[in-house]
Each structure stands twice: as C-alpha cells, then as structure tokens.
Amino acid sequence: MEHDTKRAPNETHLGYIQATITRMGQNAFQAKTWCITIITALLIFLLEKASDHSKFTTIYIAIGVVALFCTLDTYYLYLERGYRKLYKITAGLVPELPESEKLSDYDMQIPNIGRGIKEYGKAFLSVSTGLFYGLIIVLLLVLRLCTNVAEVPST
C-alpha cells in the first residue's frame, strides 16, 4: 500500500477557516451599518440643532467617522482575503508552498503570501470599501460646500 505524501484537507480545519471568513464578512457589514447610522445621526443634528459654527465641525467629525470606519472595514476585508488564501492552501487548491510557509495542523495563521501593505491597499481600493466610503466623503464635502454657499450674506 502506497503512502500518499500529499495531506488530505481536514474538514474540521476547513470549517474553522470558513467560519472565520464568514465572521470577517459580517464584521465588515456591521462596520458599514454603524457608519451609516452615525453619519445619519450627525446629519440630523446638523440640520436640526447645529449653530453656524458647529455645522462645519459636525461635517468634519462626520468625515473623521467615515475615515475611521473605512479603516476598520478595510482591515476586515484584508483579513477575510488572507483567510480565503489560507482556505485554498489548506484545501490543497494552490501549488506547493515553500518550506518556510508550510502549515501545521489546525494552523489559523494567515500565510505571508496573504499579508502586507500591498494587500491592505488592494482591500482599501476595492469596490466594497473605496467606492462606498469614497462616495460618502464626496457627499459630505458637497454638503460642506452647500452649507458654505448658503451662509454667504446676500448684498
């Protein structure tokens, strides 16, 4: 009987990785939900109660909130993509890795091929983060310009 040197994928390990991927996706969705909720609350405050001086401050706070949630969402997407690579490696769907990248049983560490500033930048510029948060920031800047124009005294 021949001994196969290639390790069969462990279903339990793949299940753990898949659960982590799902959790990262849910976290990214929750980041978007909370961002929209907080921005909506700030804009309601801006329209209802804010004085002239605090209108500008409120818009800048809203832009800061968007930047914070964009960073968080990008991080979750970055991790999700790393765990997808780990899933493919564990399932044996990618070519053999170098010896330094070998995984042990039930290893949940993202391999080096799935980490780095380049991968984080790709996650930041993806449609699900870059377009979503970029559009919100553009709309807030347009609102800032509109409130500035509305407050110019007429002669």
What do these predicted regions represent?
Residues N27, T58-P111:
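Inner-leaflet juxtamembrane helices
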Residues F45-S51, L145-N148:
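Structural signal for the C-terminal ends of transmembrane alpha-helices
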Residues Q30, K55, I59, S126-G130:
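Hydrophobic, aromatic-rich alpha-helical transmembrane segments
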Residues N10-T20, G92-A123:
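Short membrane-interface loop/juxtamembrane segments of multi-pass integral membrane proteins
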Residues I38, Y60-L68, L135-L139:
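Lipid-exposed faces of alpha-helical membrane segments in multi-pass integral membrane proteins
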Residues D52-G64, S154-T155:
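Hydrophobic alpha-helical transmembrane segments
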Residues M1-F45:
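Cytosolic-side membrane-entry/anchor segment at the start of a transmembrane helix
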Residues S104-T155:
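A hydrophobic membrane-anchoring alpha-helix module
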